[in-house]
Amino acid sequence: MIKFTLQGEFIPLIQLLKAVDLVGSGGEAQMVVQDGLVKYNGEVDYRKRLKVKKGDKVEFNGTTVNII
């Protein structure tokens, strides 16, 4: 599990995936979201520009990211 400390009100989902090094590029982040490989608060979510906020949980490739 990764704990990500949010700076500001939110972070777009694709930027979060890059920030915690779960993907190598923005293009890769967009592809994994589009392919339904990312879960947001336990549900598959296809929104690339999803605003992830404090208290949210993102899961990808066996790794969970808790937003604090």
Where are these regions (language model features)?
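Short, Lys/Arg- and Gly-enriched loop/turn segments at beta-strand edges
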Residues: T64-I68
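A basic, amphipathic helix-loop patch mediating RNA/tRNA/ribosome contacts
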Residues: I11-K54
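A detector for short, charged/polar N-terminal pre-domain segments
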Residues: M1-I11
